[in-house]
Amino acid sequence: MIPLQHGLILAAILFVLGLTGLVIRRNLLFMLIGLEIMINAAALAFVVAGSYWGQTDGQIMYILAISLAAAEASIGLALLLQLHRRRQNLNIDSVSEMRG
């Protein structure tokens, strides 16, 4: 059995790594990957806490978070494909210069 502190520290490290990738990178694909890492870190924290207290709620929240991440990834990748077809790059600065 993994102690609660170890699991939560791992989840916090993963969350900070995802947040760092989201803030530092200017490529939308890497920003999407960072967001996925953050969602998985939060889901890991739910599973660790649920395991510690002997509840199945953490696993239920994990399933919900994974389904949310799948929906977010599919929409994000569809937007990335359209952006790449129109602009031929995935730089966030080119998105902010849209017409309209």
From Swiss-Prot:
Pfam annotation, one family: Oxidored_q2
UniProt GO MF annotations: NADH:ubiquinone reductase (non-electrogenic) activity; quinone binding
Subcellular location: Cell inner membrane
Disulfide bond in keyword set: no
Gene Ontology terms: cellular component: NADH dehydrogenase complex; plasma membrane
Enzyme Commission number(s) of this protein: 7.1.1.-
Keywords from the UniProt entry: Cell inner membrane, Cell membrane, Membrane, NAD, Quinone, Translocase, Transmembrane, Transmembrane helix, Transport, Ubiquinone
Its job: NDH-1 shuttles electrons from NADH, via FMN and iron-sulfur (Fe-S) centers, to quinones in the respiratory chain. The immediate electron acceptor for the enzyme in this species is believed to be ubiquinone. Couples the redox reaction to proton translocation (for every two electrons transferred, four hydrogen ions are translocated across the cytoplasmic membrane), and thus conserves the redox energy in a proton gradient.
PANTHER family: NADH-UBIQUINONE OXIDOREDUCTASE CHAIN 4L, NADH-UBIQUINONE OXIDOREDUCTASE SUBUNIT ND4L
Family, per entry: Belongs to the complex I subunit 4L family.
Protein name in UniProt: NADH-quinone oxidoreductase subunit K
Organism name: Cronobacter sakazakii (strain ATCC BAA-894) (Enterobacter sakazakii)
